[in-house]
A protein has these predicted regions:
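Helix-to-loop junction immediately C-terminal to a conserved catalytic motif
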Residues: 53
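Conserved ABC transporter NBD signature motif
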Residues: 61-69, 78
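Conserved ABC ATPase "signature" region
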Residues: 114-132
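Catalytic Walker B motif of ABC-type/P-loop ATPase nucleotide-binding domains
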Residues: 161-164
Length: 175
């Protein structure tokens, strides 16, 4: 993974214009750092992460990931740079089994099958769930679903990984 900075400048966001969720947020995140966002329930932490990967759009301000400004026109490019693991990992698992789910993203990139198989195998090994490759998604525990979601993002080889509640449902060995 490379060193890609995230730069947020005067970010403002609201679900309803009269009720702002995030106001005048500015920061630069160094590409080599591990950073946590801390705050009370409902403070906008998950919303901020979703804004960073283009799942929501700003009311005003700007976001840059590396040298790419986050805009509707650059979403595909941003999503190759930044991977996102949802708080509820089940939201991003939709294929019949773990292997197919992890392989889905690199297949979508149009990579050759050998590369897809390699990336999938390496991602499953990285989170210690290679033995679950053929297990149906609906039979996974909460922690196994989280690990499968992380493996899915790893298979894409993004420069940045954003994780919402990264250790939720994981046992101490996998945190």
């Amino acid at each position: 993974m490379g060193q890609i900075n995230i730069e947020v400048t005067h970010l403002n966001f609201s679900y309803e214009k009269q009720n702002p969720i995030l106001q005048d947020i500015s920061f630069t995140a160094d590409g080599q750092a591990s950073i946590g966002v801390v705050g009370a329930n409902g403070a906008g932490k998950s919303t901020l992460l979703k804004l960073l990967v283009g799942l929501y759009f700003l009311d005003s301000g700007s976001i840059r990931i590396g040298d790419v400004p986050l805009q509707k026109e650059t979403l595909a490019q941003i999503r190759k740079i930044a991977g996102y693991v949802f708080q509820d990992s089940e939201s991003q698992l939709f294929m019949p089994n773990v292997y197919e789910d992890v392989a889905f993203a690199p297949q979508n990139y149009g990579l050759p099958e050998e590369e897809v198989a390699y990336r999938t195998k390496m991602a499953l090994a990285a989170v210690h769930i290679g033995h679950l490759a053929k297990k149906p998604i609906h039979k996974l525990s909460g922690g196994e679903k989280k690990l499968a979601a992380i493996a899915t993002i790893l298979s894409m080889k993004p420069d940045i990984i954003l994780m919402d509640e990264p250790s939720i449902a994981l046992d101490p060995r996998n945190r």
